[in-house]
């Protein structure tokens, strides 16, 4: 548990830690009997522009709890002295407590682990290089921007990093590539891969979190970092597929953007990082000059109750946003249960995962000459074998050898368990029947086919009607377009926001199922250096790449303005106009807690008309509304702060969504919009109220001109419900007849005294 001061309410941040230094001395003796472990200490905004002076102040602070200057110096793991001030050090629990007791200290918390969570994607999203007036060409494909990744490293030989035809490296870039095992900057970096660093000091002294297979360099064994960077910003690579599946030209969302990798993920099996290492990478990325940060990492969910600020990812991202760097992060992969969404803070752009209009299948031809298709990502040769039904696949294994096995399961984990069991017992293949409209994402080198219960029952009837049932399974094939329905994936974590329910999370959805990307050629599941990845990890770089394009078009927009443009222009249906569903039990129409504002639409986002902008004063509003005292807020923001009395309402944060988790009586919510479209514009309000909720907008019309670029409005919310309810959903739009600026409305009724 972290040690935090100046807190009057239960926790805001998960997973980060920090402190502040103003030169106050507390003399203490180091306890030689206590175990030392890494603590991350955040000191808020830098007191000096000179990074050496900042580091010296860290040294002096540590000397106050150590017996000698040398011992203090040896305890330091990382100095954070570029984008913000802080350090990671090996401390005893009592030393951490002594630091936290200082009047100039904000918080201290122990180092933790943090988990990681294309040939069709961008055509599906309408982002085509063949459109001369589209956002791709208008932004020069992101050529002048650098996108940073905090991930597992790169495989630099991948064609995704080809720099042919790229212009010189942007002048604002100050980063570099660092040499290491099998990584030579002169050979492996170029005008595409412009930065590559690795960080190991945040692990324990014997580096127990680092796999022996990995490289002590920016080179990544696992390939996750190569995947996410290629999804966001791969150069054009023709004739790519995964063993014949998903064939086409691979490209990132921003094909000319430059890539900087900060390797912080080392555990090959669990794909984890440490918080101390992550904070150091944030600090370096800010100083290097990245323009956008993509982070496929999240704290574990569901969230435990917390009474301290321990938000490494959250506070690192806050400092980045304060420097004008948008931070895009995944919602996590613990859905479809409610309250599982991660990365829930208002300065982050949090991404849920959907499928796209592409699936992979195999033909199953049975001995009665009936052919049925099932989902499969099998890339091997055609298989002919006997067919057997096994109800209890864990214990009844004697009949599996050389046969294709049919079994029925209820849960996701059972699919993997059945696959492992049939593989060990040398079955020729596996057909799994499962309830619901589930999209399989398992890539395997033997026939593995998913069907629903209805199809499974047909296959079972054939088996029982035949004395010697047989099956022939084709190699996998690719199907694009109708009739594949767009849906939010079952694994994609769901809202509401468990820490600040009035802040909608996730914010946006993007494709994250069977996404083709480049990977490490050392990785066993790689097929010629490519892989089909599934998870919010892969939806995140889709949005990050699109943000690069928007920032290239609008370099003066703040991260909040870019986020607003993404959210207010999102599709509420799929690109063909069909409804978006949400996987789960039962399957349902998607709502804002599944997909945020909707499915990302970059072409509309380039010209949103109006934006809900935020700056440091808005974030101070958020901190005050959630219970932080003036001293704590001043430390973390660097701006002298005195919260109003009574405290401001979190409902009035200028967020591009209105979420009211506990409507007891009529409430009025305020928002401000900034005109980024034609100077002389008139917008009128259009409301689709949640069921049983009355919405009144004042004024109903907004008139902008050269002297009026920002206008405020009020939304009065009341309900006719007489009892407690769940959430009801609607939307609110400002429209000028061409541009529709839409935000989600989410309201839950709480009648405390019926």
Swiss-Prot record:
One of its GO terms (biological process) is proteolysis. It is found in: Secreted. Residues 121-606 form the Peptidase S8 domain. PROSITE patterns: SUBTILASE (PS51892), SUBTILASE_HIS (PS00137), SUBTILASE_SER (PS00138). GO terms for cellular component: extracellular region. The active site is at residues 151, 224, 537. GO terms for molecular function: serine-type endopeptidase activity. InterPro entries: Peptidase_S8/S53_dom (IPR000209), Peptidase_S8/S53_dom_sf (IPR036852), Peptidase_S8_Ser-AS (IPR023828), Peptidase_S8_subtilisin-rel (IPR015500), Peptidases_S8_3 (IPR034197), S8pro/Inhibitor_I9 (IPR010259), S8pro/Inhibitor_I9_sf (IPR037045), SBT (IPR045051). Residues 39-116 form the Inhibitor I9 domain. Glycans are attached at residues 206, 239, 369, 629, 740. Residues 29-117 form a propeptide. Residues 1-28 form the signal peptide. Keywords: Autocatalytic cleavage, Glycoprotein, Hydrolase, Protease, Secreted, Serine protease, Signal, Zymogen. Belongs to the peptidase S8 family. This is Subtilisin-like protease SBT3.12. It comes from Arabidopsis thaliana.
């Amino acid at each position: 548990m972290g040690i935090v001061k100046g807190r009057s309410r239960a926790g805001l941040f998960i997973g980060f830690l920090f402190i502040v230094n103003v030169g106050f001395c507390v003399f203490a003796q180091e306890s030689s009997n206590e175990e030392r472990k890494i603590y991350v200490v955040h000191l808020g905004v830098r007191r000096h522009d000179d990074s050496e002076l900042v580091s010296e102040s860290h040294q002096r602070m540590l000397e106050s709890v150590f017996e000698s200057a040398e011992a203090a110096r040896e305890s330091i793991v990382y100095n954070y002295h570029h984008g913000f001030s802080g350090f990671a050090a090996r401390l005893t629990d009592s030393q951490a407590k002594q630091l936290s007791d200082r009047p100039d200290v904000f918080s201290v918390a122990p180092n933790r682990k943090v988990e990681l969570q294309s040939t069709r994607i961008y055509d599906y999203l309408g982002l085509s290089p063949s459109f001369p007036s589209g956002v791709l060409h208008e932004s020069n494909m992101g050529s002048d921007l650098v996108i940073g990744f905090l991930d597992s490293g790169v495989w630099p030989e991948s064609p995704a990093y080809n720099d042919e035809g790229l212009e010189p490296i942007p002048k604002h870039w100050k980063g570099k590539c660092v040499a290491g095992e099998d990584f030579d900057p002169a050979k492996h970096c170029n005008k595409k891969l412009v930065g590559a660093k690795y960080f190991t000091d945040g692990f324990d002294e014997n580096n127990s979190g680092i796999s022996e297979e990995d490289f002590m360099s920016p080179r990544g064994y696992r390939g996750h970092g190569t995947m996410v960077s290629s999804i966001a910003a791969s150069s054009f690579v023709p004739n790519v597929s995964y063993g014949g599946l998903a064939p086409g030209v691979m490209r990132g969302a921003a094909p000319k953007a430059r890539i900087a990798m900060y390797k912080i993920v080392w555990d090959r099996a669990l794909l984890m990082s440490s918080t101390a290492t992550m904070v150091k990478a944030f600090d370096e990325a800010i100083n290097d000059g990245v323009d956008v940060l993509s982070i496929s990492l999240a704290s574990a969910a569901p969230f435990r109750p917390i009474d301290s600020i321990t938000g490494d990812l959250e506070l690192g991202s806050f400092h980045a946003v304060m420097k004008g760097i948008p931070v895009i992060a995944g919602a996590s992969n613990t859905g479809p249960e409610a309250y599982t969404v991660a990365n829930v803070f208002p300065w982050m752009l949090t991404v849920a995962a959907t499928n796209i209009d592409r699936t992979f299948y195999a033909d199953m031809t049975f001995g009665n000459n009936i052919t049925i298709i099932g989902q499969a990502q099998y890339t091997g040769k055609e298989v002919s074998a006997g067919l057997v039904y096994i109800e209890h696949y864990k214990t009844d294994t004697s009949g599996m050898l050389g046969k294709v096995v049919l079994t029925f399961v209820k849960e996701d984990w059972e699919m993997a368990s059945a696959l492992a069991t049939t593989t060990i017992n040398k079955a020729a293949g596996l057909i799994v029947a499962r309830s619901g409209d589930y999209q399989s994402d398992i890539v395997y080198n033997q026939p593995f086919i998913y069907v629903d219960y209805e199809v499974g029952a047909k296959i079972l009837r054939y088996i029982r009607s035949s004395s010697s049932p047989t099956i022939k399974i084709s190699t996998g094939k690719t199907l694009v377009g109708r009739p594949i329905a767009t849906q939010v994936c079952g694994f994609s974590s769901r809202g509401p926001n468990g820490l600040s329910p009035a802040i909608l999370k996730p914010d946006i959805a993007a494709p994250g199922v069977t996404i083709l990307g480049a990977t490490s050629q050392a990785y066993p599941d790689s097929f010629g250096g490519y892989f089909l990845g599934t998870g919010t990890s892969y939806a995140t770089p889709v949005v990050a790449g699109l943000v690069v394009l928007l920032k290239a078009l609008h370099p003066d927009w703040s991260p909040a303005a870019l986020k607003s443009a993404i959210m207010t222009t999102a599709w509420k249906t799929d690109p063909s106009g069909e409804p978006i569903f949400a996987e789960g039990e039962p399957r349902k129409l998607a709502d804002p807690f599944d997909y945020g504002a909707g499915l990302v639409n970059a072409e509309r986002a380039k010209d949103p008309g109006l934006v809900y902008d935020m700056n440091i004063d808005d974030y101070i509003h958020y901190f005050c509304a959630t219970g932080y005292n003036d001293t704590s807020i001043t430390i973390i923001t660097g701006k002298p702060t005195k919260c109003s009395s009574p405290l401001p309402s979190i409902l009035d944060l200028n967020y591009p969504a209105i979420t009211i988790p506990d409507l007891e009586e009529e409430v009025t919510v305020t928002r401000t919009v900034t005109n980024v479209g034609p100077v002389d514009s008139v917008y009128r309000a259009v409301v689709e109220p949640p069921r049983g909720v009355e919405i009144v907008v004042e004024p109903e019309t907004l008139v902008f001109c050269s002297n009026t670029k920002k206008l405020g409005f009020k939304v009065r919310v009341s309900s006719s419900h007489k009892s407690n309810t769940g959430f009801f959903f609607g939307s609110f739009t400002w429209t000028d007849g061409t541009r529709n600026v839409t935000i989600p409305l989410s309201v839950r009724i709480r009648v405390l005294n019926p």
